[in-house]
């Protein structure tokens, strides 16, 4: 999660920082002895009866541990609904011995993972007022059940009221559990239909000493972090009028699917994080319970291994997808560097973040009456004209001498050192801070407890020039205002993790983008801003829930295809989307995948790039998985073909070629989901120096022809190693524009000899 769990409430600053700093999670994990619980992956179930699956787990453990009683004491969880496996307390040597068992796919230690709106859906054009809109067609998502795996939920929030909702869908098989401060009969309703808290992994990892009362936690589904409540309301929050944060961003709050049902699975806890043994159990339960989509705003750092079973979200989501349940997960918040994207398994819908067309300008008035507009969430009263000083090498001495009392401090950059210094400035009684940055990141103001504004270097230099040419420079900081619409440019923020995929570069990640900057949503009884791919993920999850109502038989891959091929490459107003990093540039597929999600287009994509179990098995073969591992994962004997399939032919709604030498031909298959008699022709935007040749030149569909395979010959004119260049391939029938991104890197020299 990194620094992405940003709370725009300075009264919550200490708690917020405790939650977002990686070091806290890591130190807590070390303190609590991370390596006691091991997760034993067995792959697909060999029995349909959960009791028989559980029995098979004991049959594996008993010989290793010497008795049934020892096996019972060791066992933490049985995973028996969506897949087979268990979590058990094992020594390192026991885990090593168990990994050699013929039925065991892999044994991995349980780990700690990190948690990674009044305007969002208006911005995306998902409007409740239009009788032809997706919301009206789906009755606001009333039949959709969205499973959220996170830090719990604050049930009293008005975002979870069930006014106007009909009966709970009959297919629901889940539970609502009571606990400390949470009464299932009182707090669950026709909106919040499921609420569980998974604690066995937590308590075993903490040796039973997780002191939840002193940490302000509850052994219940209740959310004391705020994150789970926030994301659940983004996905499926009810209509709430007059929602705002201290007067900012006022309007009607609602989720993507306002009448959808929520099932919360709490696996994340204060000062510890999210325990993977519990997270896998939550995925297992969500498969059992009958959710339509699983939303996971949790992750780690960018992966460095091909192994699906080393990725708990990747492993659990594989089995969910095999059951037809889409899994939507966050790309992570450790951007903007390349190859930082998380949750990269090709069956996961991985979500990047963008900004909204909304900003919060802060008037900064200098003593010469020049007013400069900064940015930030400043809800403090106006700071009248007061002395303006520069944060430089003399600042520490000024703090010691009390010279910062009541002043506004100008600081160039806002790195970790400056934020620590800002806390010293705050403690020394300064009245406000102005940060000057090369690329504006207003979220840094959430780290200080005084009025704060952010400007770019140009404006920062203007302020500095005024200070250097004035005997007693002064400034005034006004509260933020809310500005919506043009001329605000949409952007992929610095924190959003970028591609290419670190373990399978031919698999484009992220897949899609959604708003994740300064998103207003529910927390404990109020509404607050948070930023991160955590906030973008439930926006997509809610839209996927709506899509599953309109197309209940579409596979998770078909849904991902519809999201990608209909996405905006610009913002909804037609303006370009920029990418923030060390420099600002136009966004490309490694920033936002297929683009910004377009909810009103996604139900009618025209063509889809579909995949099923055979496609995923071909991927595993191409990723050098051996037959035995794939057979265990699948639950039956499987042999990869010889030669193994090319990962370049994996039927994704994208073409990514990380090492092109000369030329290569790739294939894709599309299925017609539009009018039966349709003719599509290609529109090609070739990457720089790359030639794309498509065959056949037309795709002619009829009542008996619903699928067509085409090839794309990719040829480079470059004769040196290049970076990635980007283009697109669009099939159009004049109504539907089925567009996929094309990313190509030419590579003549190997990285090793």
Curated annotation (Swiss-Prot):
Listed GO CC annotations: extracellular region
Q: Give the location in the cell.
A: Secreted
Record-listed E.C. numbers: 3.4.21.-
Leader sequence segment: 1-29
Does Transcription count among this protein's keywords?
no
Give, as one word, the top-level EC class: hydrolase
For this UniProt entry, what is the primary localization, expressed as one broad class? secreted
Q: A GO molecular-function term, please?
A: serine-type endopeptidase activity
Domain Peptidase S8, chain residue ranges per copy? 120-603
Domain Inhibitor I9 residues, every copy: 38-115
Family recorded in the similarity comment: Belongs to the peptidase S8 family.
Q: Per its record, how is this protein called by name?
A: Subtilisin-like protease SBT3.17
């Amino acid at each position: 999660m990194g620094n992405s769990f940003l709370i725009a409430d300075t009264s919550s600053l200490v708690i917020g920082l405790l939650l977002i700093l990686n070091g806290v999670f890591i130190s807590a994990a070390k303190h609590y002895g991370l390596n006691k619980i091991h997760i034993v992956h067995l792959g697909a179930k060999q029995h349909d009866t959960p009791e028989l699956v559980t029995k098979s787990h004991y049959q594996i453990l008993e010989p290793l541990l010497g008795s049934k009683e020892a096996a019972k004491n060791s066992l933490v969880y049985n995973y028996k609904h969506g897949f087979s496996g268990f979590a058990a307390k094992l020594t390192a040597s026991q885990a090593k011995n168990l990994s050699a068992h013929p039925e065991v796919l892999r044994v991995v230690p349980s780990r700690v993972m990190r948690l990674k709106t009044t305007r969002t859906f208006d911005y995306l054009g998902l409007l409740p007022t239009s009788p032809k809109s997706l919301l009206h067609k789906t009755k606001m998502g009333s039949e959709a059940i969205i499973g959220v795996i996170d830090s719990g939920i604050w049930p009293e929030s008005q975002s979870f009221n069930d006014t106007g909702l009909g009966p709970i869908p009959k297919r629901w098989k889940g539970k609502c559990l009571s606990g400390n401060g949470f009464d299932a009969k009182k707090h669950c309703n026709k909106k919040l239909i499921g609420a569980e808290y998974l604690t066995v992994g937590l308590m075993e990892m903490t040796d039973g000493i997780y002191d939840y009362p002193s940490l302000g936690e509850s052994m219940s589904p209740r959310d004391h972090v705020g994150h789970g409540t926030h994301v659940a309301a983004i996905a499926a929050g009810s209509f709430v009028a007059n929602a705002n944060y201290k007067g900012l961003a006022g309007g009607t709050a609602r989720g993507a699917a306002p009448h959808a049902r929520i099932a919360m699975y709490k696996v994340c806890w204060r000062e510890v994080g999210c325990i993977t043994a519990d997270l896998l159990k939550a995925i297992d339960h969500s498969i059992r319970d009958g959710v339509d989509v699983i939303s996971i705003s949790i992750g780690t750092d960018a992966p460095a291994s091909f192994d699906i079973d080393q990725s708990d979200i990747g492993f659990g989501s594989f089995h969910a997808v095999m059951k037809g349940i889409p899994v939507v997960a966050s790309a992570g918040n450790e951007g903007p560097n390349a190859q930082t994207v998380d949750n990269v398994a090709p069956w996961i819908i991985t979500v990047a973040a963008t900004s909204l067309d909304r900003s919060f300008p802060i008037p900064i008035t200098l003593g010469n009456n020049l007013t400069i507009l900064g940015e930030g969430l400043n809800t403090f009263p106006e700071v009248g004209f007061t002395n303006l000083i520069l944060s430089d090498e003399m600042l520490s001495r000024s703090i010691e001498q009390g010279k910062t009392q009541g002043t506004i401090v100008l600081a160039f950059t806002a790195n970790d050192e400056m934020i620590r210094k800002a806390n010293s400035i705050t403690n020394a009684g300064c009245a406000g801070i102005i940060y000057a940055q090369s690329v504006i990141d207003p979220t840094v103001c959430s780290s200080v407890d005084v009025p704060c504004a952010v400007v770019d270097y140009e404006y920062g230099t203007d302020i500095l020039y005024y200070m250097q040419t004035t005997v007693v420079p002064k400034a005034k900081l006004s509260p933020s205002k809310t500005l919506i619409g043009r001329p605000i440019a949409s952007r992929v923020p610095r924190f959003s993790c970028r591609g290419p995929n670190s373990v399978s570069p031919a698999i484009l990640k992220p897949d899609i983008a959604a708003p994740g900057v300064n998103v207003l949503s529910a927390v404990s009884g109020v509404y607050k801003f948070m930023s991160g791919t955590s906030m973008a993920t439930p926006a997509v999850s809610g839209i996927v829930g709506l899509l599953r109502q309109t197309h209940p038989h579409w596979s998770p891959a078909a849904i991902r295809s519809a999201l990608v091929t209909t996405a905006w490459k610009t913002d909804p107003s037609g303006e370009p989307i920029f990418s923030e990093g060390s420099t600002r540039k136009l966004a490309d597929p490694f920033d936002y995948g297929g683009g910004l999600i377009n909810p009103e287009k996604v139900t009618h994509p025209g063509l889809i790039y579909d995949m099923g179990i055979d496609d995923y098995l071909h991927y595993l073969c191409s990723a050098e998985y051996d037959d035995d591992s794939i057979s265990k994962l699948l639950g039956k004997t499987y042999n990869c073909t010889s030669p193994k399939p090319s990962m370049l032919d994996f039927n994704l709604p994208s073409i990514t070629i990380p090492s092109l030498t000369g030329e290569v031909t790739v294939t894709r298959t599309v299925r017609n989901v539009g009018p039966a008699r349709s003719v599509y022709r290609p529109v090609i935007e070739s990457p720089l120096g790359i030639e794309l040749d498509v065959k056949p030149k037309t795709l002619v569909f009829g009542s008996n022809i619903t699928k067509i395979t085409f090839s794309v010959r990719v040829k480079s004119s470059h004769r040196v190693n290049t970076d990635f260049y980007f283009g697109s391939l669009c099939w159009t029938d004049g109504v539907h524009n089925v567009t996929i991104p094309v990313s190509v890197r030419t590579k003549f020299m190997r990285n090793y000899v």
